[in-house]
Amino acid sequence: MIWNRKTRYTPYEQWPATKLPQLVAQARQSKWRMQHHIQPTSGLLNDPNGFSYFDGQWHLFYQVFPFGPVHGLKSWQHVTSKNLVDWHDEGLAIRPDTPYDSHGAYTGTALPIDDQLFIMYTGNVRTADWQRESYQLGAWMDTDNHIKKLSRPLIAHAPAGYTSSFRDPDLIRNDHGYYALIGAQTTTEIGAILVYFSKDLTTWTCQGELNVPANARGYMIECPNLVWIDQQPVLLFCPQGLSQATIPYQNIYPNMYLVADQLNLAQAQFTEPHALTQLDDGFDVYATQAINAPDGRALAVSWIGLPEISYPTDRENWAHCLSLVKELTLKDGHLYQNPVAAVDDLRTTAHDLVFEQQRATVAALNGSFELLLTVPADKTVTVNIADQQESGQLQVTVDANHGQVMIDRRHTGNSFAEDYGQTRQVELTAHKTIKIRLIIDVSVFECYIDNGYSVMTGRFFLNATPSRLNVQGDTTAVTGKVWEWRQSEHTGVDNNETKIK
């Protein structure tokens, strides 16, 4: 397939009827299909959208282009869950079928209001001369998952002084009404977050620009997301073009967070924003969406993928996945991330690490498993994740002497994104015990360090299913356990074809 403007934006109904079933069948045959991470049945998945709890279950949407591993004509795919682990595919929910989203239904969020779910999202439109127009749109979903779009945009254009790069509304409700944080770019190409207010979800007025520190803006801010943890505001966002002088990062675009003491939305003012911090220290996290659950917990899910990067699965006409759902907590102003408790229910058979001659091996694993490892102060060990033939490996080095964790994907057998480096490293306190929780799901890893103080996430592509784990090095007093995971009960991952309704 030659991907150009015409093929990327061909209306779905103009594709041959046989095309989508062929792509779904091709993706199902991939050795890199995951068991527990949400992934597209075909084509490209990107940003998580509309994460919410409504009508007794969790709802999550994601952007998808079903016809290829490229950023084309985007829709929202819909999945639901009772436990945040097992997801059911509800099919395509929002399609690009109006004059205001004709070239893609882009990122947005959702709020349960009475017996409906209100959705606010960005509609992408291209003019005849391919100029961008961005509309902030609204829709209502009922308890039968039927969606009715509003006939007119909620916000028809960016205010004066801002470009048409104006997208990704984050809905917030408080005692005064409704707010929306919208990613933006000034006409001088500086990233911004605009704050809008509405009393009725229909008429919206701009309250001004959120006082994000000047060195944290880049040239465009995408995917702003606000949650409260212990009554403190936490802003997650993606400042494209962020200066390396502000904070060093290796990925093409970073996903960052800011904690502040207080936030006055009416005045668009943070009080005492803390230091800008990278949300994930791995290779592939972007566009994280976070919400406050009905019980107050802050929950987040990330796109494990990056714009403008080619992945090995592109050759199979599918790309990317979402992270496991993570719970966010604060301690001493630092954001901790850990998988939600229901992830523990995936565990089945346990294997204690038994070391012989400074090495322990667990074999015959089924591709999805986790390692809990404790490395005492001044010890260094290396964890290797390999296929049965050990033709390639993902390597995790835990150095409790220098206080470092490094992940190396140079030798997996299928390299990609090499321009951005094949190793990532987290710096911790030297001469202290380090604990890691390493989750492997066929072609994705999530590594939680010191109870979620740091997280490293990424894709890796072995030549066959990961089935061997070994730990070696100075293993004196090192302890660990490997848990196999049960097979997926997801119908939202691989057991359902994309429904185009």
UniProtKB/Swiss-Prot annotation:
Keywords: Carbohydrate metabolism, Glycosidase, Hydrolase. Its EC number is 3.2.1.26. The active site is at D47. One of its GO terms (cellular component) is cytoplasm. Substrate binds at L44, L45, N46, D47, Q63, Y106, T107, R167, D168, E222. It catalyses: Hydrolysis of terminal non-reducing beta-D-fructofuranoside residues in beta-D-fructofuranosides. Pfam families: Glyco_hydro_32C (PF08244), Glyco_hydro_32N (PF00251). SMART domains: Glyco_32. Belongs to the glycosyl hydrolase 32 family. This is Sucrose-6-phosphate hydrolase. The gene is scrB.
